[in-house]
Regions:
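Conserved active-site and cofactor/substrate-binding residues in soluble primary-metabolism enzymes
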Residues: 10, 14-17, 83-86, 120-131, ...
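Glycine-rich phosphate/diphosphate-binding loop of Rossmann-like nucleotide-binding domains
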Residues: 181, 186-288
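Rossmann-like adenosine-cofactor binding region
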Residues: 249-339
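General beta-strand structural signal in soluble alpha/beta enzymes
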Residues: 90, 146-148, 171-177, 220, ...
Length: 420
């Protein structure tokens, strides 16, 4: 079972440490540091929900706006038993830098509700979503803060959020959230965007490092939206996906898993458990497999100082947010592992969310080929920007990405000044 936090360091401590490292490397002015290090707004809400039994259960919800100097706050909503305020603050912080790295006009936001959606009915999830949306309604809006899907939230949940907001306004407001169903103003290609963006950064890494995708041995930790799509695209490019895991099982086949069949099995059963033609292994064994590309696509702090030395790979592609702790970063640097940092690797999702927002605001929609072509251009350009800084400043890729993102946010704050 994968957990969100470890005893080593919580996600927000990781975010702050990585900020300080980048700010030091940039020699950032102390006044700018003070302006952009911490969240602008932090909201905690009580969310009472009438369950199917008639009992009223109270859930804890959060919405954090980290920085809006470059545009409206942007970031997903997650439903998970381990959601905490510190986790949401960390994710909002990373969203600020992520949007800046891919140079889209958004700031960083994030939200979540501490709940177990797997044990809730569709009706209970709808009630929870509408109550939570009503509670954070003063903070959100197409020009203020635009939520999106995240862990265990779906296009249907985004549709309920959009409807709740619209009912309060008295007219349809499609652009208040992204990741919606296409029938409600969602964008073609949005569902695959995070995994597709990850794939593009892996391609770019391979080109620069001389590691071709064809024949590369891949391990995927986390087989949700991002992990499964990345695995599918790599499999289509003739990589060999040796192993995959979700919250219930880790499986391995030395000759390569049949990814199309594995995706169908997961859709049918909700789990990787019981997939034929695969050996069950432990999560620890999965991370220690000899491979060329490791994709941590689950939750934060999956790879720490305790297990990083057991990892045997050439590339780590962070499809999840914050899966590698600073101590694990240092170990990977010692071992010569090339890491594609989360704020670059998984930025495909927010990039196509931006496309969706643009399409909703303009009432003009693009076909899927246009969406994917625009995404590839942005992800490739952004990778090249980070890789260039990595080489010029002789810093690791995470520090280079943070320097690029934080530098752009700092410049926006500097140009805007301080009001009043």
């Amino acid at each position: 079972m994968l957990t969100t936090l470890t005893a080593e360091m919580n996600a927000y401590q990781v975010a702050l440490e990585n900020f300080d490292l980048a700010a030091d490397a940039l020699d950032l002015d102390p006044s700018l540091r003070a302006m952009i290090k911490y969240p602008e707004r932090v909201l905690s809400v009580s969310v009472p929900v009438r369950m199917d039994t008639g009992q009223i259960v109270r859930f804890e919800g959060y919405r954090v706006q980290h920085n809006t100097a470059r545009g409206p706050a942007k970031g997903g909503i997650r439903y998970h038993p381990n959601v905490t305020m510190d986790e949401v603050k960390a994710l909002a912080t990373w969203m600020s830098w992520k949007c800046a790295v891919v140079n889209i006009p958004f700031g960083g936001g994030k939200g979540g509700v501490t709940c177990n959606p797997k044990r809730m009915s569709a009706g209970e999830l709808e009630h929870l979503t509408r109550r939570y949306t009503s509670a954070i309604l003063p903070l959100i809006g197409p020009e203020k803060d635009i939520p999106a899907p995240d862990v265990y939230t779906t296009p249907q949940i985004m549709a309920w959020m959009m409807d709740t907001y619209s009912m309060h306004k008295g007219y349809p407001v499609h652009s208040v959230v992204t990741g919606k169903p296409v029938s409600l103003g969602g964008s073609l290609g949005r569902n695959e965007a995070t995994g597709r963006g990850c794939f593009y950064t892996i391609q770019s890494s391979g080109s620069n490092l001389g590691i071709p995708v064809k024949g590369a041995r891949v391990v995927v930790q986390g087989f949700g939206n991002a992990g499964s799509i990345a695995a599918h695209l790599l499999d289509s490019a003739q990589a060999v996906v040796l192993a995959a895991s979700d919250s219930t099982a880790a499986i391995f086949n030395r000759h390569g898993l049949d990814i199309p069949k594995l995706i169908m099995h997961k859709e049918r059963t909700g789990s990787l458990s019981g997939f034929p033609a695969a050996e069950t292994i432990t999560p620890e064994e999965l991370l220690s497999l000899d491979c060329d590309i490791l994709i941590p696509a689950a939750l934060e702090n999956a790879i720490t100082g305790d297990n990083a030395r057991a990892v045997h790979t050439r590339i780590v592609a962070e499809a999840a947010n914050g899966p590698v702790t600073p101590e694990a970063d240092r170990i990977f640097a010692e071992k010569g592992v090339f890491l594609i940092p989360d704020i670059l690797c998984n930025a495909g999702g927010v990039t196509v969310s931006y496309f969706e927002w643009v399409q909703d605001e303009s009432h003009l929609f693009w076909d899927e080929n246009d969406v994917n072509a625009k995404l590839e251009r942005i992800m490739t350009r952004s990778f090249n920007d980070v890789f260039k800084l990595h080489q010029e400043r002789n810093v690791n890729m995470r520090l280079a990405a943070n320097m690029l993102g934080i530098g752009r946010v700092a410049e926006a704050c500097r140009m805007r000044g301080l009001y009043p």
